[in-house]
Amino acid sequence: NENLYISNEQFIYYFNELLSNFKIEFIYPTHDDIANFLAKNQIHIKAKVITSSIQANHISRFKKETYYHFKNYDFCPIVYSHESKEIKFPVFLKPNDGQGGKEGFVADNFNELNFYFSKYKNLIITEFLPGEELSVDCFTDFKGNLLFIGPRTRERIQMGISFRSTSVELTEEIKYIANTINNNLKLNGAWFFQIKKDSHYKYKLLELAPRQSSTMGVYRHSGINFALLSFFNAQNIPVKILKNEYPIKLDRC
């Protein structure tokens, strides 16, 4: 139904009609554009949107906003302008409003850089990060307390989604990044971020999103039910995290 695309001018009217007909009271957005749209329009929607603030959704949706917001922290990657003569190759190019590594390219020189800019609009240029990549699943309660940080691998990627992922140890470096993000954005409920090591083996921030990720199910097997926690949290019901301490590997076709 074309009326139920957020690009449709009548979307909110038809969406509210659907919510009323099916007596839906809570919405879990699982796509960045939809989460951003619903957060901005929560006042017009006849159900509770389980996501973070408008600020957190906007900053996390656009890479330029994300990197500008965290530019004073050492985990923010180097960002170049296309006109800069100081670019250190190789560099990584990606859409400002992209996700999951889609339409991402490595450029080894100015010719390749200009080629990609001639074919794709709205690209940003960052330093190339050659090291290990992780997703980090988090949960922040309605009081702003970061209650859970769960790093996991991205071993097999399809469509920008981790189809094989293993829980790994939480280090002080990852904990610092998570707490810094949480202290700088108005986050509420489940959220996640992705990091990758640079040439000096330090993690740099790739992206973040104030929603549930596709592979948060890794930690569901450790007792962390992000969906249920977020449901209680959306109603200002205090929750506690009880994690089973054993490694988990998730693999799917």
Report residues per predicted region.
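Glycine-rich, highly charged phosphate/nucleotide-binding loops
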Residues: 1-18
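A short, GP-enriched loop/loop-strand-helix hinge that lies immediately N-terminal to
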Residues: 22-61, 74-79
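ATP-dependent carboxylate/phosphate-activation module, predominantly the ATP-grasp catalytic core
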Residues: 126-186, 197, 209-235
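Peripheral (often C-terminal) accessory segments that flank ATP-dependent C-N-forming ligase machineries
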Residues: 228-253
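Active-site regions of enzymes building and remodeling cell-envelope glycoconjugates
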Residues: 1-5, 46-50, 91-94
